[in-house]
Amino acid sequence: MADQFADSANNVVIEEVNKGLNPGMIVLIVVATFLLLFFVGNYALYVYAQKTLPPRKKKPVSKKKMKREKLKQGVSAPGE
């Protein structure tokens, strides 16, 4: 892919086209690859954790909240 140009003395000048990857493009590909691996790895760990870890325990409901809920429903709280 060499382009030829003729100057005023009819000498032929051959310009070589730069072949290969631009260094900026190499950096972009490397960074994009690391980001892709990071997100794929996180997703794999998330799926693995969902399958293997037990579900979280719910916090116990306080007696005060239970009493308030029963009063809202119209049921008298025990002991009253």
Swiss-Prot record:
GO BP annotation list: regulation of DNA-templated transcription
Protein name, as recorded: DNA-binding protein S1FA2
Biased composition (Basic residues): 55-70
Protein localization: Nucleus
Its job: DNA-binding protein that specifically recognizes a negative element (S1F) within the RPS1 promoter.
GO MF entry, a single one: DNA binding
One Pfam family from the record: S1FA
InterPro entries xref list: S1FA_DNA-bd
Domain of life of the source: Eukaryota
Chain location of the short sequence motif Nuclear localization signal per the record: 54-59
Family to which the UniProt record says this protein belongs: Belongs to the S1FA transcription factor family.
CC per GO annotation: nucleus
Alphabetized UniProt keyword annotations: DNA-binding, Nucleus, Repressor, Transcription, Transcription regulation
Annotated stretches, region: Disordered: 55-80
Organism: Oryza sativa subsp. japonica
Gene: S1FA2
Predominant location category: nucleus
